[in-house]
Amino acid sequence: MKVIFTQDVRGRGKRGQVKEVPDGYAQNYLIKRGLAKVATKGNMNTLKRVEANEKAAYEAEKAEAEKIKAELEKDDTIVNFKSKAGTDSRLFGSISSKKIVEGLEKQYGIKVDKRKLNLPEPIKTLGYTNVHAKLFKGVEATIRVHVTEQD
């Protein structure tokens, strides 16, 4: 019997895959537990529509990430912060990924999730710092952060 897997089944198939399986296994296990559906014409058309929608959503998300990357990598896109500092250029406090994301949104209107930033530890010195951001699978950008001393 041909079935369409609705979930991953270890050793049998992945979600969205169409496979031939024994009738008893399909009826008594896969279909009963909601792991698969019978591969009828209607179900096949639904599967194609769902795959097309998922692909379109993936492409839209990737295009949005590319757009954000292009905006971040412009020469004039530098996130500026003013902070109090000591004599050795060390900040009183620090600039975290949360503050960087807030600064990006406030200064340029760019929204980025703070979890996408690769900042091992907060910025604690004055000057320029490059912060890498993984915006999407295969789309990475560099955010330039400039910390100056507050008067």
From Swiss-Prot:
Keywords: Ribonucleoprotein, Ribosomal protein, RNA-binding, rRNA-binding. GO terms for biological process: translation. Coiled coil: none annotated. Gene3D superfamilies: Ribosomal protein L9, C-terminal domain, Ribosomal protein L9, N-terminal domain. The keyword RNA-binding applies. It comes from the Bacteria. One of its GO terms (cellular component) is ribosome. InterPro entries: Ribosomal_bL9 (IPR000244), Ribosomal_bL9/RNase_H1_N (IPR009027), Ribosomal_bL9_bac/chp (IPR020594), Ribosomal_bL9_C (IPR020069), Ribosomal_bL9_C_sf (IPR036791), Ribosomal_bL9_N (IPR020070), Ribosomal_bL9_N_sf (IPR036935). GO terms for molecular function: rRNA binding; structural constituent of ribosome. The keyword Ribosomal protein applies. PROSITE patterns: RIBOSOMAL_L9. Binds to the 23S rRNA. NCBIfam families: L9 (TIGR00158). PANTHER family: 50S RIBOSOMAL PROTEIN L9 (PTHR21368). Belongs to the bacterial ribosomal protein bL9 family. This is Large ribosomal subunit protein bL9. It comes from Lactobacillus helveticus (strain DPC 4571). The lineage of its organism: Bacteria, Bacillati, Bacillota, Bacilli, Lactobacillales. The gene is rplI.
